[in-house]
A protein has these predicted regions:
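Bacterial Sec-dependent N-terminal signal peptides
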Residues: 1-8
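Periplasmic N-terminal soluble interaction domains immediately after the signal peptide in Gram-negative
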Residues: 37-77
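Short, low-complexity, polar/charged sequence segments that are solvent-exposed and flexible
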Residues: 27-31, 54, 63-67, 90-91
């Protein structure tokens, strides 16, 4: 069991669709044992086998499906594929979800 590690990653998102996308996609990766993303604090709790997948690979994968992490920024192309409801870089979308926060890496749309 020495290869199994627990970690927490900050992953941006604003709704239950984001939660489902993040958890369902990440759990499908080889080496991921557990994935649980919290909408309120944006923390993804992971248990993974470091011999099968690295933390860097996990960050890159999350960015590839459109979600910024505390270490990796999703390309505009990947981000723009998200449902409009999930576009967490847009202040109005965040506000519409009843949230009062900025994206992890700042915003590319008008804020307040």
């Amino acid at each position: 069991f020495a290869q199994t590690k627990s970690t927490k990653i900050i992953v941006d998102g604003v709704c239950m669709m984001c939660e489902e996308r993040i958890e369902k996609n990440i759990i499908g990766l080889k080496g991921i044992k557990l994935a649980n993303w919290n909408l309120e604090n944006r923390i993804l709790k992971l248990v993974y086998n470091e011999k099968k997948i690295s933390l860097d690979e996990i960050h890159k994968f999350l960015a590839s499906i459109g979600h910024d992490t505390n270490k990796e920024i999703a390309s505009n192309q990947a981000y723009n594929l998200l449902d409009p409801c999930c576009q967490y870089r847009d202040f109005q979308v965040v506000k519409d979800h009843g949230l009062d926060r900025k994206p992890i890496h700042g915003s590319n749309k008008k804020e307040q």
